[in-house]
From Swiss-Prot:
GN (gene name): OSTF1
Stretch forming the signal peptide: none
Taxonomic lineage: Eukaryota, Metazoa, Chordata, Craniata, Vertebrata
SMART domains named in the record: ANK (SM00248), SH3 (SM00326)
Descriptive protein name: Osteoclast-stimulating factor 1
Key words, A-Z: Acetylation, ANK repeat, Cytoplasm, Phosphoprotein, Repeat, SH3 domain
Subunit details: Interacts with SRC and SMN1. Interacts with FASLG.
Amino acid sequence: MSKPPPKPVKPGQVKVFRALYTFEPRTPDELYFEEGDIIYITDMSDTNWWKGTSKGRTGLIPSNYVAEQAESIDNPLHEAAKRGNLSWLRECLDNRVGVNGLDKAGSTALYWACHGGHKDIVDMLFTQPNIELNQQNKLGDTALHAAAWKGYADIVQLLLAKGARTDLRNNEKKLALDMATNAACASLLKKKQGTDAVRTLSNAEDYLDDEDSD
């Protein structure tokens, strides 16, 4: 009886490594890669042979080679976002690296893209249907806090248009508006908060009207 096929890997379960040496395959099933190549491990169900992808090619890699001859990259999406490296970010997403993963600071890749002012990275992350806009890191800051603090009005505008919340406070009880370092960011945030306040008031009035009509 043949064993069932391995379950497809879930986003976020992909392990990512950088090859320290070139690997020469001995069989057609094995994956060739060179020193410095990024390897995405998608199936570790076999203890001896792992399935991996590099430069669009997929094949088998001896697990002991990866363990001994490759450098683990813990948060590749975050690194790509910090550096503004769009091609690497796209490759990570294509290889199902989780878009909402958190680094040691509790930050997402979106946070670092906003912190660095990398609008093209933010645009690419926004193509992911399950992107989390309002994740707060260990300091309580969101991507909107980061963009406002660094003064990137174009990114603040993108986040607000996507539906980022303006009412979240960080550990110092500060809103994104309180963190804004220039007039353009502050103006966008004030306008959005004003719109939200009017909408909330309108909803409350509708609720009271409904109660009165009962």
